[in-house]
Protein backbone atom coordinates (compact mmCIF):
# COMPACT_ATOMS: atom_id res chain seq x y z
CA UNK A 1 0.00 0.00 0.00
CA UNK A 2 2.78 2.41 0.89
CA UNK A 3 4.72 1.53 -2.28
CA UNK A 4 1.62 2.33 -4.34
CA UNK A 5 1.16 5.65 -2.46
CA UNK A 6 -2.31 4.62 -1.31
CA UNK A 7 -3.59 6.41 1.78
CA UNK A 8 -6.98 4.73 2.03
CA UNK A 9 -8.59 1.53 0.81
CA UNK A 10 -11.26 -1.07 1.38
CA UNK A 11 -10.25 -4.73 1.35
CA UNK A 12 -12.70 -7.54 0.68
CA UNK A 13 -12.64 -11.23 1.61
CA UNK A 14 -10.23 -10.59 4.49
CA UNK A 15 -11.13 -13.81 6.35
CA UNK A 16 -10.29 -12.43 9.83
CA UNK A 17 -11.58 -14.45 12.80
CA UNK A 18 -11.37 -14.15 16.57
CA UNK A 19 -10.26 -10.51 16.30
CA UNK A 20 -6.85 -11.57 15.02
CA UNK A 21 -5.54 -9.09 12.45
CA UNK A 22 -2.99 -6.31 12.16
CA UNK A 23 -4.40 -3.12 13.62
CA UNK A 24 -1.50 -0.79 12.80
CA UNK A 25 1.57 -1.15 10.60
CA UNK A 26 3.91 1.26 8.80
CA UNK A 27 1.74 4.27 9.65
CA UNK A 28 -1.52 2.60 8.59
CA UNK A 29 -4.51 1.87 10.80
CA UNK A 30 -6.63 -1.17 9.96
CA UNK A 31 -10.20 -1.92 11.05
CA UNK A 32 -11.55 -5.32 10.00
CA UNK A 33 -14.80 -7.17 10.56
CA UNK A 34 -14.69 -10.32 12.64
CA UNK A 35 -16.11 -13.34 10.87
CA UNK A 36 -17.83 -16.11 12.84
CA UNK A 37 -16.70 -18.71 10.27
CA UNK A 38 -13.00 -19.27 9.67
CA UNK A 39 -11.61 -18.62 6.16
CA UNK A 40 -14.71 -16.90 4.84
CA UNK A 41 -15.73 -13.38 3.78
CA UNK A 42 -15.02 -10.19 5.75
CA UNK A 43 -14.01 -6.63 4.89
CA UNK A 44 -11.47 -4.16 6.22
CA UNK A 45 -10.63 -0.50 5.78
CA UNK A 46 -7.04 0.71 5.98
CA UNK A 47 -5.89 4.32 6.13
CA UNK A 48 -3.03 6.55 7.17
CA UNK A 49 -3.04 10.16 8.19
CA UNK A 50 -2.96 12.67 5.37
CA UNK A 51 -3.03 16.45 5.16
CA UNK A 52 -5.72 16.12 2.46
CA UNK A 53 -8.36 14.17 4.39
CA UNK A 54 -9.33 12.71 7.75
CA UNK A 55 -10.94 9.32 8.36
CA UNK A 56 -13.42 9.37 11.24
CA UNK A 57 -15.89 7.08 12.99
CA UNK A 58 -14.79 3.76 11.46
CA UNK A 59 -17.08 0.98 12.63
CA UNK A 60 -18.17 -2.52 11.82
CA UNK A 61 -21.74 -2.72 10.64
CA UNK A 62 -22.23 -6.46 10.44
CA UNK A 63 -19.83 -9.24 9.50
CA UNK A 64 -19.32 -8.04 5.91
CA UNK A 65 -19.90 -4.29 6.21
CA UNK A 66 -17.73 -1.42 7.49
CA UNK A 67 -18.56 2.25 7.37
CA UNK A 68 -16.63 5.44 8.02
CA UNK A 69 -16.69 9.15 7.39
CA UNK A 70 -14.13 10.86 5.19
CA UNK A 71 -13.64 14.61 5.63
CA UNK A 72 -11.96 16.36 2.70
CA UNK A 73 -11.89 20.13 3.11
CA UNK A 74 -15.47 21.39 3.06
CA UNK A 75 -16.96 18.06 1.94
CA UNK A 76 -17.84 15.08 4.10
CA UNK A 77 -18.40 11.57 2.71
CA UNK A 78 -20.11 8.62 4.34
CA UNK A 79 -18.51 5.51 2.84
CA UNK A 80 -19.75 1.96 3.23
CA UNK A 81 -17.48 -0.94 2.28
CA UNK A 82 -19.13 -4.31 1.79
CA UNK A 83 -18.69 -7.83 0.51
CA UNK A 84 -21.70 -9.91 -0.53
CA UNK A 85 -20.74 -13.54 -1.03
CA UNK A 86 -22.39 -15.27 -3.97
CA UNK A 87 -24.48 -17.46 -1.64
CA UNK A 88 -25.26 -14.69 0.88
CA UNK A 89 -28.76 -13.25 1.00
CA UNK A 90 -28.68 -11.42 4.34
CA UNK A 91 -25.73 -8.98 4.11
CA UNK A 92 -27.70 -6.64 1.85
CA UNK A 93 -29.90 -5.95 4.89
CA UNK A 94 -26.81 -4.77 6.82
CA UNK A 95 -25.82 -2.57 3.87
CA UNK A 96 -29.30 -1.00 3.74
CA UNK A 97 -29.24 -0.47 7.53
CA UNK A 98 -25.86 1.26 7.21
CA UNK A 99 -27.23 3.45 4.38
CA UNK A 100 -30.16 4.47 6.58
CA UNK A 101 -27.62 5.45 9.28
CA UNK A 102 -26.06 8.05 6.94
CA UNK A 103 -25.08 11.21 8.83
CA UNK A 104 -26.83 14.43 7.83
CA UNK A 105 -24.85 16.46 5.29
CA UNK A 106 -22.51 13.64 4.24
CA UNK A 107 -22.47 12.40 0.64
CA UNK A 108 -23.03 8.65 0.36
CA UNK A 109 -20.74 6.13 -1.37
CA UNK A 110 -21.05 2.35 -1.27
CA UNK A 111 -17.97 0.44 -2.42
CA UNK A 112 -17.85 -3.31 -2.58
CA UNK A 113 -17.97 -6.67 -4.22
CA UNK A 114 -21.65 -7.46 -4.77
CA UNK A 115 -21.16 -10.70 -6.74
CA UNK A 116 -23.90 -9.74 -9.16
CA UNK A 117 -24.39 -7.46 -12.12
CA UNK A 118 -26.73 -4.66 -11.10
CA UNK A 119 -27.80 -3.72 -14.62
CA UNK A 120 -28.66 -7.31 -15.56
CA UNK A 121 -29.40 -9.43 -12.49
CA UNK A 122 -28.80 -13.06 -13.39
CA UNK A 123 -32.43 -14.19 -13.44
CA UNK A 124 -32.08 -15.12 -9.79
CA UNK A 125 -33.92 -13.66 -6.86
CA UNK A 126 -30.71 -12.70 -5.01
CA UNK A 127 -29.42 -10.43 -7.80
CA UNK A 128 -32.83 -8.87 -8.30
CA UNK A 129 -33.20 -8.21 -4.55
CA UNK A 130 -29.75 -6.57 -4.33
CA UNK A 131 -30.40 -4.34 -7.35
CA UNK A 132 -33.85 -3.37 -6.04
CA UNK A 133 -32.59 -2.58 -2.53
CA UNK A 134 -29.76 -0.36 -3.76
CA UNK A 135 -31.92 1.37 -6.37
CA UNK A 136 -34.57 2.06 -3.71
CA UNK A 137 -31.91 3.94 -1.73
CA UNK A 138 -31.18 6.14 -4.76
CA UNK A 139 -27.77 4.64 -5.55
CA UNK A 140 -26.34 4.46 -9.06
CA UNK A 141 -23.13 3.00 -10.48
CA UNK A 142 -20.57 5.80 -10.66
CA UNK A 143 -18.46 3.99 -13.29
CA UNK A 144 -21.12 4.49 -15.97
CA UNK A 145 -20.69 8.27 -15.65
CA UNK A 146 -16.97 8.10 -16.44
CA UNK A 147 -16.64 6.05 -19.59
CA UNK A 148 -13.07 5.31 -20.66
CA UNK A 149 -11.99 5.27 -24.29
CA UNK A 150 -11.44 1.57 -23.97
CA UNK A 151 -12.66 -1.09 -21.62
CA UNK A 152 -10.45 -1.16 -18.55
CA UNK A 153 -12.22 -3.47 -16.10
CA UNK A 154 -12.67 -7.19 -16.41
CA UNK A 155 -15.83 -9.17 -16.09
CA UNK A 156 -16.25 -12.79 -15.19
CA UNK A 157 -18.04 -14.87 -17.79
CA UNK A 158 -18.83 -18.58 -17.89
CA UNK A 159 -21.38 -21.04 -19.17
CA UNK A 160 -23.39 -22.62 -16.38
CA UNK A 161 -26.10 -25.17 -17.21
CA UNK A 162 -26.16 -24.00 -20.83
CA UNK A 163 -26.62 -20.34 -19.88
CA UNK A 164 -23.95 -17.61 -20.10
CA UNK A 165 -23.41 -16.03 -16.69
CA UNK A 166 -21.58 -12.68 -16.52
CA UNK A 167 -20.67 -10.60 -13.52
CA UNK A 168 -18.90 -7.36 -12.77
CA UNK A 169 -18.42 -7.72 -9.08
CA UNK A 170 -16.84 -4.53 -7.78
CA UNK A 171 -18.88 -1.35 -7.64
CA UNK A 172 -18.68 2.20 -6.40
CA UNK A 173 -22.24 3.43 -5.99
CA UNK A 174 -23.31 6.95 -5.16
CA UNK A 175 -26.30 9.24 -5.16
CA UNK A 176 -24.89 12.17 -7.15
CA UNK A 177 -22.27 11.79 -9.90
CA UNK A 178 -21.80 15.58 -10.02
CA UNK A 179 -19.80 15.35 -6.80
CA UNK A 180 -16.93 13.66 -8.64
Label every PLM stretch briefly.
Residues 1-180:
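A shared catalytic/ligand-binding motif for oxyanion handling
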